[in-house]
């Protein structure tokens, strides 16, 4: 419980894109987005290595790969425009880099929603030391 409190305090200062991504996750899963996924499995959160532990963790792996294709802005810091229309996330930026970041986040949020049945609390706050298998390629 103490660790979750620390994570919550750290996230209170998060601005811009990460709060946008959390909002997308919340809309698609009904969960408190960032807290539910920030340190889940081997790929959700900062960095990532090893083998994705389940379909939820694979959503994060694919999200990391997507960020790796973004050029011209920092995916973790860029603020983009988006809206929710009839339950769908719609990215609305004219800037190609910001639109790409939004699309990465949109696809990941949808993936989390589609794979909620694989979410397993044993992978919350998962140890980095359990992610030592060879990493897959994007």
Curated annotation (Swiss-Prot):
Cofactor note: Binds 1 Ca(2+) ion.
SMART domains in the cross-refs: PA2c
Positions of disulphide bridges: 42-131, 44-60, 59-111, 65-138, 66-104, 73-97, 91-102
Expression sites by tissue: Expressed by the venom gland.
Keywords, comma-separated and alphabetical: Calcium, Disulfide bond, Hydrolase, Hypotensive agent, Lipid degradation, Lipid metabolism, Metal-binding, Secreted, Signal, Toxin
Pfam family, one: Phospholip_A2_1
Statement: the UniProt record of this protein carries the keyword NADP: no
Annotated residues for binding of Ca(2+): 43, 45, 47, 64
Leader sequence segment: 1-16
Recorded catalytic activity of this chain's protein: a 1,2-diacyl-sn-glycero-3-phosphocholine + H2O = a 1-acyl-sn-glycero-3-phosphocholine + a fatty acid + H(+)
GO biological process: arachidonate secretion; lipid catabolic process; phospholipid metabolic process; regulation of blood pressure
Presence of keyword Protein biosynthesis: no
Catalytic residues (UniProt): 63, 105
Cellular localization per UniProt: Secreted
EC numbers: 3.1.1.4
InterPro entries from the UniProt entry: PLipase_A2, PLipase_A2_Asp_AS, PLipase_A2_dom, PLipase_A2_dom_sf, PLipase_A2_His_AS
Organism superkingdom: Eukaryota
Function: Snake venom phospholipase A2 (PLA2) that causes a sudden decrease of arterial blood pressure when injected into rat, but is not lethal. When co-injected with an uncharacterized basic protein (which did not show any enzymatic activity, but also causes a drop in blood pressure), this synergistical mixture is lethal. PLA2 catalyzes the calcium-dependent hydrolysis of the 2-acyl groups in 3-sn-phosphoglycerides.
Family to which the UniProt record says this protein belongs: Belongs to the phospholipase A2 family. Group II subfamily. D49 sub-subfamily.
Name of the protein described by the UniProt record: Acidic phospholipase A2 VpaPLA2
């Amino acid at each position: 419980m103490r660790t979750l409190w620390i994570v919550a305090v750290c996230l209170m200062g998060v601005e811009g894109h990460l709060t946008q991504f959390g909002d997308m996750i919340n809309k698609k899963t009904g969960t408190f987005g960032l807290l539910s996924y920030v340190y889940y499995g081997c790929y959700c959160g900062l960095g990532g290595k090893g083998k994705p532990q389940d379909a939820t963790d694979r959503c994060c792996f694919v999200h990391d790969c997507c960020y790796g294709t973004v050029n011209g802005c920092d995916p973790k810091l860029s603020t983009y425009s988006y809206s929710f229309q009839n339950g769908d996330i719609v990215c609305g930026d004219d800037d190609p880099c910001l639109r790409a970041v939004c699309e990465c986040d949109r696809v990941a949020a949808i993936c989390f929603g589609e794979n909620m049945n694989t979410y397993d609390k044993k992978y919350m706050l998962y140890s980095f030391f359990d992610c030592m298998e060879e990493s897959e390629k994007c």
